Amino acid sequence: MATGPPTLALVLIGAISVLWGLNWPAMRVASVELGPWTFRAICVAIAGPGLLVIAAHRKEPWWPRRMAWPRIALLGLSGVTGWQLLSAMALTRIGGGAAAIIGYTMPLWAALISALWLRERLDLRRAGALLLGASGMLVLFRGGLAGLAEAPLGVALMLGAALCWAVNTVATKAFSWDIGVIALSGWQLVLGGIPILLAWRILEPDPDLSRLTAAGLAGVSIGAQWTVDGLPLVILVFAH
């Protein structure tokens, strides 16, 4: 995958920030009303096949070579199964704002994983940037740490989700791909969504749609749309 111009990267980062900000409060409502498994099952069931249809319609290379399937499975298990489930479960225990900030520890973990896996040098500039980012997160959390201490499982789940996202990002960068970004995102969602769909049928009862409020329905819609739009954007920005 070729690196795009810096201006494009900045625009994409801005788009991710807006989508991310809209996504978390809505996702929390949907996760609480429907249950985390049901909510995520709906998102991946819509987004995965939808992205593959879009890739085929755009005549983008979309069928991976045989050697690529284990790599895509790794991406799916980390970036879809791990990230989607852990973050949805975290949202039933902590607020959307706190979850979003914890989720944004991903670059910290990605930098450490890249140093170990890709042998990328963690020089003074990068270390300083990571330290500055971590300090900024602590400032955002100021005054709310006591509340998070009362929900340690929610914090642990969200940290696990951020770690899964970091593994997905570094793995995407580590391998070469002969399919496009949209198709790669779609196959991740299809393969990573299979465990979610199976667990949903086993662990969670049929959803009571009568409990779904207008806010919950909006949360499902925004969550599914973010899954469609967000994963390709994340790959374009962070995995280069």
Describe the function of each predicted region.
Residues M1-A41, G147-I179, A183, I194-L198, ...:
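Glycine-/small-residue-enriched transmembrane alpha-helix faces in small-molecule transporters
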Residues L8-L10, S31-G82, P107-I113, C164-A171, ...:
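Transmembrane alpha-helices of multi-pass small-molecule transport proteins
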Residues P25-E33, W62, L91-T92, F141-A151, ...:
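Membrane-interface helix termini and inter-helical loops of multi-pass transporters
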Residues V32-P49, A88-M106, A151-L163, T227-F238:
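Structural signature of hydrophobic alpha-helical transmembrane segments
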Residues E33, R93, R119-R121, D178:
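Helix-loop interface residues and adjacent transmembrane-helix termini in multi-pass membrane transporters
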Residues C43, W63-P70, A100-G103, R119-V139, ...:
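Loop-to-transmembrane alpha-helix entry segments
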Residues L51, A73, I113, L122-G143, ...:
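Hydrophobic transmembrane alpha-helices of multi-pass small-molecule transport proteins
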